[in-house]
UniProtKB/Swiss-Prot annotation:
InterPro entries: AB_hydrolase_3, AB_hydrolase_fold, Acetyl_esterase, GDXG_lipolytic_enzyme, Lipase_GDXG_put_SER_AS. Keywords: Cytoplasm, Hydrolase, Serine esterase. This is Acetyl esterase. Pfam families: Abhydrolase_3. It comes from the Bacteria. The keyword Transit peptide does not apply. It comes from Salmonella typhimurium (strain LT2 / SGSC1412 / ATCC 700720). Its EC number is 3.1.1.-. A motif (Involved in the stabilization of the negatively charged intermediate by the formation of the oxyanion hole) lies at residues 91-93. Belongs to the 'GDXG' lipolytic enzyme family.
């Protein structure tokens, strides 16, 4: 797609989204485009500090969980002494960036809005860790807390997964992995998915959207995929291209959120249409005027807070529904 033929999304954003795009953090250096991956990870952490400020206070606990790949750091957010369910959160960042600190505010808000314990999983990043390591680490974390629930005052009879962007793929892939491998970690009552990618290699939205403003050009997406996968054959794996998995049965209820001007929006649309066609419980909501990753910006965007509350309401409704 010739860049000039793409939709000029920056002229169509909401006022809130435009304010975020134009916001300049004092003293923040430019993105180190030519830096190595560790330099970019440190920059991402620095840039996200502002957006994670002023988050709700609550009891937190850090725990190193043993997995087949070594210990994985987790952080438990407990808004109240007892919880009706446990929600596992997988952060975004193209599989190569991000950690528990870059998504701290999102997890705190989600814990407050659901009233449930949220467990953030600091899965190993690519390219150092390749598919399916992050999924297997997530499953190992779920198994660990299922076996040690009393020690951490957890309710693991009802669990859920949540994630944004690449984390949304990992959230859904992990739930399907549990189903497909017959691993019991609790009853998965819901999956909360914000602007994920689910396996499309091309789409109308990938042609029309994406640029320097969101880090999701065709070249960017190819780079993330190349860093994450072991080889070309992995592209068709049912836990990477989730449309190659069986989405006709036993898929936990999914809240599928998308951003209007996200090149990945067609992934969310296709996922919703597929689940809906096969009577799998799901809800789809598109947030107008937004770009990919808008969930981070709840300090300046009420719609980001709305999107979190919408997901929380979906999860809470499933806590009350026998499944």
């Amino acid at each position: 797609m010739k860049p000039e033929n793409k939709i000029p999304v920056l002229t169509r954003l909401s006022d809130e989204m435009t304010a975020v795009v134009n916001f300049q953090q004092p003293g923040l250096p430019p993105w180190p485009a030519d830096g190595d991956i560790e330099t970019q990870r440190q920059y991402y952490l620095l840039e996200r500090r502002f957006w994670n400020a002023d988050a709700p206070s609550m009891t937190t606990r850090t725990c190193a969980v043993p997995t087949p790949y070594g210990d994985v750091t987790t952080r438990l957010y407990s808004p109240q002494p007892t919880s009706q369910a446990t929600l596992y959160y997988l952060h975004g960042g193209g599989f190569i960036l991000g950690n528990l600190d870059t998504h701290d505010r999102i997890m705190r808000l989600l814990a407050r809005y659901t009233g449930c314990t949220v467990i953030g999983i600091d899965y190993s990043l690519s390219p150092q860790a390749r598919y399916p390591q992050a999924i297997e680490e997530t499953v190992a974390v779920c198994s660990y807390f299922s076996q040690h629930a009393d020690e951490y005052s957890l309710n693991v009879e009802k669990i859920g997964f949540a994630g944004d962007s690449a984390g949304a793929m990992l959230a859904l892939a992990s739930a399907l992995w549990l189903r497909d491998k017959h691993i019991r970690c609790g009853n998965v009552i819901a999956i909360l998915l914000w602007y994920g990618l689910y396996g499309l290699q091309d789409s109308v939205s990938r042609r029309l959207f994406g640029g320097a403003w969101d880090g999701l050009t065709r070249e960017d997406l190819d780079m993330y995929e190349k860093a994450y996968l072991r080889n070309d054959e992995d592209r068709e794996s049912p836990w990477y291209c989730l449309f190659n998995n069986d989405l006709t049965r036993d898929v936990p209820p999914c809240f599928i959120a998308s951003a209007e001007f996200d090149p990945l929006i067609d992934d969310s649309r296709l996922l919703h249409q597929t689940l809906q066609a096969h009577q799998q419980p799901c809800e789809y909501k598109m947030y107008p005027g937004t770009l990919h990753a808008f969930l981070h910006y709840s300090r300046m965007m009420t719609i980001a807070d709305d999107a979190l509350q919408d997901g929380a309401r979906f999860f809470m409704a499933r806590m009350k529904t026998p499944r």
